[in-house]
Amino acid sequence: MNTPTRHPTPNVTTGALPASRKIYVAGEMHEGIRVPMREIATHPTAGEAPLPVYDSSGPYTDPDVSTDIREGLAPLRAAWIKARCDVEAYSGRDVTAADNGFVEGDRLVPEFPVKPAPLRGRQRAAPTQLAYARAGIITPEMEFVAIRENQLRDLSPCHCARDGEDFGANIPDYVTPEFVRAEIAAGRAIIPANINHPELEPMIIGRNFKVKINANMGTSSVTSSMEEEVDKLVWAIRWGADTVMDLSTGRNIHNTREWIIRNSPVPIGTVPIYQALEKVNGIAEDLTWEVFRDTLIEQAEQGVDYFTIHAGVRLHMVPMTVERVTGIVSRGGSIMAKWCLHHHRESFLYEHFEEICDICRQYDVSFSLGDGLRPGSIADANDAAQFAELETLGELTKIAWAKDCQVMIEGPGHVAMHKIKENMDKQLECCHEAPFYTLGPLTTDIAPGYDHITSGIGAAMIGWFGCAMLCYVTPKEHLGLPDRDDVKTGVITYKIAAHAADLAKGLPGAQRRDDALSRARFEFRWEDQFNLSLDPETAQSFHDETLPKEAHKVAHFCSMCGPKFCSMRISHDIRAEAQKEGFEAMAAKFREGGELYVPLKDTAPEEA
């Protein structure tokens, strides 16, 4: 007798991070706006105000908010969407057996308990942030992200200080709602926010804003479950993921995705061709426009915020990949290339792209135009196939913009460091400054198990050059499906890369957290060092491995140098002695006997 598959209610991690509390900043233009941030407190002896930082963790880190996975999150944006009077509720399509991979009975993931009627744009209305921006309308979402980007900065010199090279970007000292509107209207930024994802806390992706990161997750035909995926979602955003892509394959795709979206405060992206392929039993040649169209509508009704569409893979480009070391490494790209070769025609994604735009326009699903021909090895970087597809993505961008659809462009991949900037420059030129979203890129191919590092190097560089969002890579890349620990490692690695890029491109205020932690380090405030870091738990555990006692939390040394060789302790002694004797006296003392190099007398011959 077969044992029934059990589907327990997922347990997710909640509660604030150390020394942190959730704060909310009210809007001024629109009622009801409360922008979440995390405030990190320092020790009272520091004499410093709490530090506000960007927070994508949603209500899960707010002890004053009760969350129940079975009910989902509160519909934050529902009133904003309704007030615009350009959408309508309708019955929606019926869920079919194919939507969940034909799984039945006790192996079927239960439906999410709450199922609201889906919304769509009325008649010819375009309920997209791009359409509103072009009409001169500043939406609540635009004000929300402006407040969020500023992180309680003001226009004072200390808050607007910047030191970097932005390579021609237009980064303002202070982000206003009007600046957000103008960037979206120009196509340089997007707010991925499906009208059927009201639980979303709006965020912005663009070159002139904070660099964002995405975390991938998803079930496969081999491993993982709905419970694990919901837990990984909450875990990823706890550590700073700005968006999450559900790349599920195998069975139970529809129901698992519903649980994820209803419990996600961040945008959710998908690759619809994966589910469409499951509906035709994994046979790429059997894919049709009708199956794909139905899948788009299914996912749009659920609330997916952005679609990766590999419409740039064209028939004449496929032969360009034959001599590559690693061929076509994109799953979506390889699926469409196989379809094109079998049918010897352009893909239905390319031929029906305007119809795809019409669907996305109805729900404000943003495009993430996929790089199906991205290089899978540094030997293949910047080749003819990659850049031919990029040019096509630029053409498709204009078509989507004409339909009032928001667009970002996906990029590589595997690229050696000296070739990275060319990728950014070509993307800006070919794709008309639409936001760039890259996987890494990985800068070397010799480190399986450490590709979060090989890619973090490239991610920091391309983020500095202008990339708007970085897709994380975990230690399991090329090796297996990431688990909870891998997700955290990938997210933290990419938060480091994104922040390093923000510093390098001169984002105002980016250095505030660095300076706060540096002061804590110099003053031996160990607890503050832990709490101000991206990963307080790991920082403290490393410290406590060798100095675990509470007394060590105030010690003026660590186990690396010990008490006699700590450079910062010696610096404190030098500073104290200088203050005691006076800087002028100290200077005189050094002049008398402290010179390391004695100047030579002038031995040049006198002029005759």
Swiss-Prot record:
The keyword Transferase does not apply. Keywords: 4Fe-4S, Iron, Iron-sulfur, Lyase, Metal-binding, S-adenosyl-L-methionine, Thiamine biosynthesis, Zinc. Its cofactor is [4Fe-4S] cluster. The keyword Lyase applies. Catalyzes the synthesis of the hydroxymethylpyrimidine phosphate (HMP-P) moiety of thiamine from aminoimidazole ribotide (AIR) in a radical S-adenosyl-L-methionine (SAM)-dependent reaction. InterPro entries: ThiC, ThiC-associated_dom, ThiC/Bza_core_dom, ThiC/BzaA/B. Homodimer. Zn(2+) binds at H414, H478. Its EC number is 4.1.99.17. Substrate binds at N216, M245, Y274, H310, S330, R331, G332, D371, G372, L373, R374, E410, Y437. It catalyses: 5-amino-1-(5-phospho-beta-D-ribosyl)imidazole + S-adenosyl-L-methionine = 4-amino-2-methyl-5-(phosphooxymethyl)pyrimidine + CO + 5'-deoxyadenosine + formate + L-methionine + 3 H(+). GO terms for molecular function: 4 iron, 4 sulfur cluster binding; carbon-carbon lyase activity; zinc ion binding. GO terms for cellular component: cytosol. GO terms for biological process: thiamine biosynthetic process; thiamine diphosphate biosynthetic process. Belongs to the ThiC family. [4Fe-4S] cluster binds at C558, C561, C566. This is Phosphomethylpyrimidine synthase. Pathway: Cofactor biosynthesis; thiamine diphosphate biosynthesis. Binds 1 [4Fe-4S] cluster per subunit. The cluster is coordinated with 3 cysteines and an exchangeable S-adenosyl-L-methionine.
